[in-house]
């Protein structure tokens, strides 16, 4: 590879990484709190806890913002969502929405 290309690519990736850091946590990072109840990859194993995997991103984002803003009430979710920024909510919503859910026939 040409040295100029390597330098350009390095500078570009540093710029993108800095932008991502400035925007807050990634969806996967925010999700580390969620997986305790909602399961790895959003497939819940606890009774009464909804699975998040494959849910529409806009739905997940809307619900988290309602929990954060006190418009939807759940003691646990209101506390968990409170410190999240819009960018973090959008990132974690996109992260859970990306997983496909496969249902087995009985």
Residues of each region from the PLM?
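N-terminal signal peptide c-region/cleavage motif recognized by signal peptidases
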Residues: 15-19
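C-terminal capping alpha-helices of c-type cytochrome domains
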Residues: 82-106
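Gly/Gly-Pro-rich "capping" loops immediately C-terminal to redox-active cysteine motifs
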Residues: 42-69, 78-82
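Cleavable N-terminal signal peptides
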Residues: 9-10, 20-21
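Sequence/structural segment immediately N-terminal to covalent heme-attachment motifs in c-type
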Residues: 21-43, 53-55, 104
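Extracytoplasmic/secreted proteins, especially bacterial periplasmic and envelope-associated proteins
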Residues: 33, 59, 76-79, 91
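Extended intrinsically disordered, low-complexity coil regions enriched in Ser, Thr, Gly, Ala
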Residues: 71-73
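Bacterial N-terminal signal peptides that target proteins for export
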Residues: 1-7
């Amino acid at each position: 590879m040409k040295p100029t290309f390597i330098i350009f690519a390095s500078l570009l990736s540093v710029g993108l990484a800095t932008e991502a850091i400035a925007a807050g946590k990634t969806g996967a990072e925010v999700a580390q709190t969620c997986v305790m109840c909602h399961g790895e990859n959003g497939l819940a194993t606890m009774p009464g806890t909804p699975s998040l995997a494959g849910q529409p991103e806009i739905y997940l984002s809307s619900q988290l913002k309602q929990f954060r803003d006190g418009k939807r009430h759940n003691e646990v979710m209101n506390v968990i969502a409170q410190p999240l920024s819009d960018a973090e909510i959008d990132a974690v919503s996109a992260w859970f929405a990306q997983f496909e859910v496969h249902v087995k026939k009985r």
